Amino acid sequence: MLLSVCSRFISSPSAAAVIRSSRAAASALPRTYSSISATEIAERTKRMLDAKEQSGLSYDELATKLGVTNTYTAQLLMSQAKLTSETAIKLQEALPTASKQDIEDMQTTFPMRAFDEAILKEPNVYRTYEAITHYGEAIKSIINEQCGDGIMSAIDFYCDVGTTTGKHGEKRVVITFNGKFLPHIEQKMDDNSAKSPRD
């Protein structure tokens, strides 16, 4: 999945431009916006991944200690999700070499949930992307048939990655998407709480 996004973010020319503009604007922006410094985010990500490596814990083991999915665990370390105060305590205990400042910043900084397009050149990521796009129309058709006219939320959403063993003894990857169904609405005027620009 898209688990190595942040560690690769600063490698592209477009990211370099973002970094330069971010540095120039840093003094004028509140610290709670993660866009103030892409390099700062990338450096913190490296420190957190180093702390994970030093702990000897796998993503699955760390996820169990935190009580979240393994992909969400990876997102936390890669600054793709916001750390809650409850989970912060568990994370500090699980990764004792992680700095208190990094743990604090992970709670106060709003993530930039985006990715550098260069990540799609990574074969593992691209094949996952390819699978989703290849099966996309079929998946949409089945969602429509089973749930109606709408979409699967990626906000009220859980993602978990695991493995299983095939009938020939081979290891196989299992990726589970669990998202709330969000129906499209009929835009009735009586239900619109915003003032119409035509009024």
Label the predicted regions.
Residues 67-83:
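Recognition helix of helix-turn-helix/homeodomain-like DNA-binding domains
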Residues 59, 70, 88:
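Helix-turn-helix DNA-binding elements, focusing on the entry/boundary residues of the two helices
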Residues 53-55, 78-86, 97:
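Short, solvent-exposed alpha-helical "recognition" segments
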Residues 104-183:
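Helix-turn-helix/homeodomain-like alpha-helical modules used for DNA recognition
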Residues 61-64:
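Short alpha-helical "recognition helix" segments of helix-turn-helix
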Residues 30-54:
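A short, Lys/Arg-rich alpha-helix, primarily the initiator
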Residues 86-102:
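DNA major-groove recognition helix of helix-turn-helix/homeodomain DNA-binding modules
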Residues 1-36:
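N-terminal mitochondrial targeting presequence
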